[in-house]
Amino acid sequence: MAGAAVTAAIAAQPRRPIKWPAQAMIHVWLDPRTAPPGAGALVDRALRTWNAAAGGRFVLRKEGSSASASVRVRFAQADGIYGETSPRIDGATGFIGSADVLIAGDLAGDATQQRIVIYLTALHELGHALGLPHTDAFDDIMYSFRRPDDGARYFGAYRRRLRSAEDIGSERATGLSPADVAALQSLYDG
């Protein structure tokens, strides 16, 4: 889902984990001009999902203004990708200082499929904005999505777990694997 920008940034610092400072209040802004209808609620669900997984190690908070936001989420034509995240590391502290998240807004499929793709892509890209790298485990939201059909297979597997579209991003269908939660908590406990 993510492009080379986040992978290179995370790989460039093998000695020190890339993350936000302890107990950070991370302000997230969603560009309303670019968001498809209903996308804001799905991004909100992704924020709540990561907040629950963090258990107070940080707080992602929706912000009404881009000027005071550390993470900016925008939607755009995807050109073959679902999303991309570009974190910026603060040279003085070594912590993430800000991140730009881009999510595909031009999606095919029925309304439920579009909601699934937006939610899971937001969850994946926000995971990168928090400092999580790709994994090789298909069940993880941070899976690397290397094969051409990985996205369709992953989104299809998630859809089969839903009882209805209202389950998207619910406690019953967070989209996070136990390994995703463990990786996040380990990153912020270290």
Predicted feature locations:
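Disordered inhibitory propeptide/activation segment of secreted metzincin zinc metalloprotease zymogens
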Residues: 1-38, 47, 84-92, 176, ...
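Metzincin-family zinc-dependent endopeptidase catalytic domain
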Residues: 39-140, 146-150
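Acidic/histidine-rich, surface-exposed loop or edge segments in extracytoplasmic proteins
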Residues: 20-35, 96-105, 160-167
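Extracellular (secreted or membrane-anchored) zinc-dependent metallopeptidases
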Residues: 138-190
